[in-house]
Regions:
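Short, intrinsically disordered, charge-biased short linear motifs at domain edges
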Residues: 1-3, 57-60, 69-73, 132-138
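N-terminal helix-cap/turn-to-beta initiation motif at the start of protein domains
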Residues: 2-14
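Short, solvent-exposed loop/hinge segments that bridge or flank secondary-structure elements
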Residues: 12-39
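Extracellular/mature segments of secreted proteins
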Residues: 15-18, 24, 64, 77-85, ...
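Broad, structure-driven detector of short, well-ordered beta-strand segments within folded domains
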Residues: 22-28, 51-53, 102-106
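Central antiparallel beta-sheet cores of small beta-barrel/beta-sandwich binding domains
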Residues: 34-83, 146-150
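Long, ordered, amphipathic alpha-helical scaffolds
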Residues: 88-89, 100
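Glycine-rich, aromatic-bearing surface loops/beta-hairpins
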Residues: 95-150
């Protein structure tokens, strides 16, 4: 498992899957009013496919809950619109070198050593981004720290 760079915030962390087919890149939200605690993209390498993701805090029980979307419409959208473009949703965890799992922390926190997205691989295989000329390798559910974006 990878070790995050000292001083790297979650908002600047970049992760890779074990097969080198995906890159998960966090980017700053920079808004105290935002409902999300983190924003990220998941790039299917060697394709033009890039998915948008958000992590939101959820209470009872306390969880960091993520959503991964592809080509969602902008503006005033319905729940059906969001469901149609959602590829995956679920808990988002950090995993340290000891294998200890915790909720992914907000963007200002130190970068996690690994990010665990349970079930993301099977969800991608069942989605609109899977197939010839698209994603052909399903990511492992754990992505390891790769670098800190500048």
């Amino acid at each position: 498992m990878a070790v995050a760079a000292p001083g790297c915030r979650q908002a600047s962390a970049v992760y890779a899957d074990r097969d080198g087919a995906y890159e998960l890149r966090f980017t700053p939200i920079n808004s105290d009013a935002a409902a999300a605690s983190n924003r990220f993209t998941l790039k299917v390498l060697k394709t033009s496919i890039e998915l948008d993701g958000y992590v939101m805090p959820f209470n009872d029980p306390e969880r960091a809950v993520g959503i991964l979307m592809f080509k969602c419409p902008g503006g005033d959208v319905t729940g059906a619109d969001l469901d149609a473009c959602t590829i995956w949703r679920g808990a988002v965890y950090s995993v340290n070198a000891k294998g200890e799992i915790d909720n992914l922390q907000p963007e200002a926190a130190a970068a996690a050593e690994n990010v665990f997205l349970p079930g993301v691989g099977p969800a991608i295989r069942q989605s609109q981004i899977w197939g010839n000329g698209k994603a052909t390798v399903a990511p492992w559910d754990v992505l390891a720290f790769k670098e800190c974006a500048k």
